[in-house]
Amino acid sequence: MSEIREARLLKANSLVKKGFEPYAETFKITHSTKFLTEKFGYLENGQDFNLDVAIAGRVLAKRVMGKIAFYTIADQEGKIQLYLEKKILDDFEIHAKLLSFEDLKEIVDIGDWIGVYGTIKKTNKGELSIKVSKWEMLSKSLQPLPDKWHGLTDIEKRYRQRYLDLIVNPLSKNVFKTRAKCISLIRRWLDEKNFLEIETPILQSEAGGAEARPFITHHNTLDIPLYLRIATELHLKRMVVGGFEKVYELGRIFRNEGISTKHNPEFTSVEIYQAFSNYIDMMNLTEDLIRDIVLSCCDSLIINYQEKVIDFSKPWKRISMKDVVMEYTGIDFDSFNGDLNKAMKDLEESNIEISPKINTLGRLLNEVFEEKVESQLVEPTFVIDYPIEISPLARPHPENKEMVQRFELFIAGRELANAFSELIDPVDQRKRMQLQQSLRDAGDLEAHCIDEDFLQALEIGMPPTGGLGIGIDRLIMLLTNSPSIRDVITFPLLKPEITSTKSEKSTSNEVK
């Protein structure tokens, strides 16, 4: 690798000696590869079109055959072939201080960025090309690209060096184009329905709104601890109290938790709050929003995800947590009549392993659901009516005070969205937060803490409100058929790379 770098540094220095800059300041582009291929694909083989173009891209391939060369360059939108003749380039070189055909052969490597001027041509073999009249070096690459046939076989390297992954793997580039499109569509969809996008603090004095461990930092001037937000919920609810009836925030969330194919400590979500609504209204909103996003991004409401066919066109199933556990496991939690010991004994006899930390029937129900049911929910399914002890911010169910008006949406065996009829009773909310604080004091670092300012806001008065959170990264996984969350985050958090030796540093031929 160091020999290749040394050779390329020599080429960069040769440009300097000829009076050319190997790292250009700018280049004025007139067209993209996508525009040219779409606009001039109709040309007959061998036909020229006299349109002056200036185009730039990274060199991905080159073939030199005597006095003719064919290069392939890629920009953000696609690829195009360059047709280069020695006579044409050298004629221009005579009349102006330009780089020659020989310079091209000797200096340009795969991986370099070059800019070219020329006209449109379709070769005799039917390849749309730029007939180049002059060229410029825009950025000399000092390191070779991964082998084009084998690409990046090390999956970890794809994540660590995403720039290489994007160069050699068109599918990865498409993933992030889809991600950008999806996020733009969500914002537009909500804006058109008169939701107002709000920005809430990332640094917070209290980390609330979810059961999760926060990242902690320190503000030097104020000499206080601060937390990276684990949710936007409590601040968005304050905005509803303040009179904004339809609000949302799409942004980054930070949770100091494990890393897996489904979890990254830094992730993106959208939280949506709508006054005068309940969890049924938010269910309808969720179904409409995600269905529209799927259709816009995939051109179909039936998609393939990891060898599973998922149909978004049918009405989505809605089923209570108790009923879905009964359906998939045969366990009837109502038959326990509130007796936790009986439930634990029956589950043990059924060879279902349960954490010894489980201390309520509601938590036990949730544990069985997560262990035995969740992964089987492939088609879009709203699981509704959750235990109150795992939902401290949700409104109690009017027919069963041990449950709350909450749903989670599951697709392809993963949770994609979480929503409530929000708890707006300040007295009840204080009791729930006090219970959470006692759990936190007892060692549960994911339990909620008491947020006095939020409780004061509730006492001012919050209208009936439905709240919803959607995991953007998991949605992108579905839209792009990606098996891991790391595939859809540009630079996911990874374990530190272990290297046995320090990388060699070569300075002998640095560009002067």
UniProtKB/Swiss-Prot annotation:
Cofactor details (free text): Binds 3 Mg(2+) ions per subunit.
Keywords: Aminoacyl-tRNA synthetase, ATP-binding, Cytoplasm, Ligase, Magnesium, Metal-binding, Nucleotide-binding, Protein biosynthesis
Annotated Mg(2+) 1 binding sites: 408, 415
Gene that produces this protein: lysS
Location in the cell: Cytoplasm
Protein name per Swiss-Prot or TrEMBL: Lysine--tRNA ligase
Record's subunit section: Homodimer.
Family assignment from sequence similarity: Belongs to the class-II aminoacyl-tRNA synthetase family.
